[in-house]
A protein has these predicted regions:
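Mobile-element integrase/transposase regions
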Residues: 1-35, 60-61, 69-74, 185, ...
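Basic, flexible linker segments flanking DNA-binding modules
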Residues: 1-12, 110, 168-180
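Mobile genetic element proteins and their domesticated derivatives, centered on retroelements
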Residues: 4, 20, 36, 42, ...
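Hydrophobic (often cysteine-bearing) scaffold residues that line and stabilize catalytic clefts
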Residues: 14, 33, 50, 54, ...
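Short conserved beta-strand segments at catalytic cores or DNA/RNA-binding microdomains
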Residues: 21-53, 63-66, 120
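Short small-residue beta-strand/loop micro-motif enriched in glycine and branched aliphatics
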Residues: 41-47, 101-104, 129-131
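RNase H-like two-metal-ion nuclease catalytic core shared by retroviral integrases
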Residues: 79-81, 87-91, 103-125, 139-145, ...
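C-terminal domain-tail junction helix/linker
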Residues: 95, 121-189
């Protein structure tokens, strides 16, 4: 079932998350990147990469996310209807962590998972196209490092996102938890 129905706004962390896979061509092959983004603040909460686009890549992303963020358990996680997301191994990972699966409608359109599609476009533009670079100038190992740093360091902590009030995702998250605890955001670190 499509639990999000193209509504990617969330009023708290881990109430709605989205996931997808993208392909990045490297000098020595293809790299497949699977990520989970929190709709609340656009934080990249989970990331896995491999040279094969198999279901286990997506299951590993779920496992990585729950290891880093135990509060992800119980979230709604939206994806397209790709074979990775309908596989037994992926669904087993969701069930193990109590994550509720949401999938776009049969015969869905790119707008059904627009949040992820736009995140991939931004990453490729900011890492490569806007700098006159090509992903094929880099090896798979170099690409893994670049993409990991882009999301986990730059995107989450420093990139200003206009759609969340002109701040980085980590700042919006700090403010949310600061409001809940009554402690200043700086004390939350």
């Amino acid at each position: 079932d499509d639990l999000l129905k193209r509504d990617f706004k969330a009023d708290k962390p881990f109430s709605k998350c989205v996931t997808d896979i993208t392909e990045v061509k490297g000098k020595n092959g293809k790299l497949y990147v699977s990520a989970i983004f929190d709709c609340y603040d656009l934080t990249a909460v989970g990331l896995s990469m491999d040279d094969n686009m198999i279901a286990e890549l997506c299951a590993a992303t779920v496992e990585n996310t729950t290891a880093a963020y135990p509060e992800f358990c119980g979230a709604v996680l939206h994806s397209d209807r790709g074979s990775q997301y309908t596989s037994d191994s992926y669904r087993a990972a969701l069930n193990e962590y109590g994550v509720r699966q949401s999938m776009n409608s049969a015969g869905g359109r790119c707008h059904d998972n627009a949040r992820c599609v736009s995140m991939w476009a931004r990453m490729k533009n900011e890492l490569f196209y806007s700098r006159g670079r090509k992903s094929t100038d880099y090896t798979i190992e170099q690409l893994k490092t670049m993409i990991w740093r882009y999301y986990m360091s730059y995107w989450n902590n420093r990139r200003i996102c206009s759609s969340i009030g002109g701040m980085p995702p980590a700042e919006k998250r700090r403010r949310y938890y600061s409001d809940k605890t009554g402690k200043p955001a700086a004390a939350m670190e």
